[in-house]
Design a protein with these regions (language model features):
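Core alpha/beta nucleotide-donor-binding catalytic domains of modification enzymes
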Residues: 1-124
């Protein structure tokens, strides 16, 4: 899998090798595999994790696990807690749309503030 990723990366995104990258890490399989591949490739990444507070203690546990994973790999880790349900209600949008808006607005904010040149998200 790594060899295919490496070839795809070099063929389609050669500029990423020298860029400061923000990697969105949900804790799910897709984003964790992406993190592993990026670490193996030696990319300059920082982690961003959104806690949408939709799953109670499980949401908090995910954030703690991601912080430990970042520390273990000596990666900068940005964590943010959102009041997603209130935001969705106030904007009269679905929880999914609210989470998407909150997530990508925050990623844009981080990119400007910390000069990230690319944002990677793991979705199948």
């Amino acid at each position: 899998m790594f060899k295919k990723f490496q070839i795809h990366l070099l063929d389609n995104f050669p500029h990423l090798k020298n860029q400061k990258i923000l990697l969105a890490l949900s804790g799910g399989l897709d984003s964790c595999v992406l993190l592993s591949l990026c670490l193996k490739q030696g990319l300059n990444i920082s982690i961003a994790h959104c806690n949408f507070q939709l799953r109670g203690k499980d949401s908090e546990d995910d954030a703690l696990w991601i912080k430990k994973l970042a520390d273990k790999n000596k990666l900068e880790c940005k964590l943010k807690r959102f009041n997603t349900e209130v935001y969705a209600k106030n904007k009269k949008i679905s929880i999914q749309m609210a989470a998407r808006k909150l997530r990508y607005d925050w990623f844009d904010e981080l990119s400007v503030k910390h000069n990230y040149e690319a944002i990677l998200v793991g979705h199948h």
